[in-house]
Design a protein with these regions (language model features):
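Positively charged, low-complexity, intrinsically disordered RNA-binding extensions
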Residues: 141-247
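N-terminal cationic and glycine-rich segments that engage phosphates or anionic surfaces
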Residues: 1-143, 186, 243-246
Length: 247
C-alpha cells in the first residue's frame, strides 16, 4: 500500500521545532491540561491523555515534566481554562490552511491569526471553507534512520500486517520512513500496539491530511506563504497548522 507521504515535511517541521523546544513543550503542556480536564489524570482510563503522553515522549519531553503537567492539571481547579478553536483560510494562490489553537483569550488569538494571514497576502475565511479539502486521520511515522540508530531490524511486511490487524487503513513503505494511516477512532489502538512492540515513532497524532497537494512556483507566493506559516508557528496559542502546499 502506498500514498503521498509527507515524511519530508514532518522531518523538516521536527528539525525546525528542535530549535524551539520551549514552544513545543508549551503546546504539549496545554494539550495535557485539556486532556486531564476532559478525562481525568489516569492515562489508563483516558485515551486522549495516553495519546498526548506518547506525543510528549516522541518530542523528548522529560517524564518528570509530563508528570508535573498532569498533577498541575488535576489539582489546579482554578487554573487557566483553554478552549479549542479552529480557523480556516487561504494563503497565496489559494493554498488551503487550517489553524487549530488552544487559547484562554479567543479575541487575542483571532487577531493574531488574522494578522498572520494578512501579512502573507492571505485571508481568514468562514468555518468549512477549506476543511472539506482535508481528511481527519491518525498518522504514525516510523523513521528508518531512527530504527537503524537503535539497531532495530524491521520486516516491512510484518510491520504492515501488525498495523493493519490493529485497525490501520493504510501502510506506506517510503524511502525514509514507514507511514501508517488510521481512522481517528482507531488511532489510539494502533499506536498502542506499535508501542508495545517497541517501535520508535517520529510522529504519532491525529492530523488533517490534504486530499490533494498544490505546488507553488512563484517565488513571491512561496515567500508570502512562509511568512504566514512562520508567524503562526511563533504564536503560543497555535497548536497545529495544516495546509495543502506541496513543499
Amino acid at each position: 500500500m502506498s500514498g503521498h507521504s509527507k515524511f519530508a515535511n514532518i522531518k523538516h517541521k521536527k528539525e525546525k521545532n528542535d530549535a524551539k523546544k520551549g514552544k513545543i513543550f508549551t503546546i504539549i503542556g496545554r494539550e495535557i491540561a485539556v486532556a486531564v480536564k476532559d478525562g481525568g489524570p489516569d492515562p489508563e482510563n483516558n485515551s486522549k491523555l495516553r495519546d498526548v503522553i506518547a506525543k510528549a515522549k516522541a518530542n523528548n519531553m522529560p517524564n518528570d515534566t509530563i508528570d508535573r503537567g498532569i498533577k498541575k492539571a488535576a489539582g489546579d481547579g482554578d487554573g487557566v481554562n483553554y478552549e479549542e478553536v479552529t480557523y480556516e483560510g487561504y494563503g497565496p494562490s489559494g493554498i488551503a490552511i487550517i489553524v487549530k489553537a488552544l487559547t484562554d483569550n479567543k479575541n487575542r488569538t483571532a487577531s493574531n491569526v488574522r494578522n498572520a494571514f494578512t501579512k502573507g497576502s492571505g485571508s481568514v475565511g468562514t468555518q468549512g471553507c477549506v476543511s472539506y479539502m482535508f481528511d481527519e486521520k491518525g498518522q504514525i511515522i516510523i523513521s528508518k534512520e531512527e530504527l537503524e540508530d537503535n539497531d532495530i531490524e524491521v520486516d516491512a511486511d510484518e510491520l504492515m500486517m501488525l498495523a493493519l490487524d490493529a485497525g490501520a487503513e493504510d501502510f506506506s513503505d517510503e524511502e525514509e520512513a514507514y507511514e501508517i494511516i488510521t481512522a481517528p477512532e482507531d488511532f489510539s489502538a494502533v499506536r498502542e500496539v506499535l508501542e508495545k512492540e517497541n517501535y520508535p515513532m517520529a510522529s504519532a497524532e491525529v492530523t488533517m491530511i490534504p486530499q490533494n497537494y498544490v505546488t507553488l512556483t512563484d517565488e513571491n507566493d512561496i515567500r508570502q506563504l512562509n511568512r504566514t506559516l512562520d508567524l503562526l508557528d511563533e504564536d503560543d496559542d497555535v497548536q497545529n497548522v495544516y495546509h495543502n502546499w506541496d513543499e
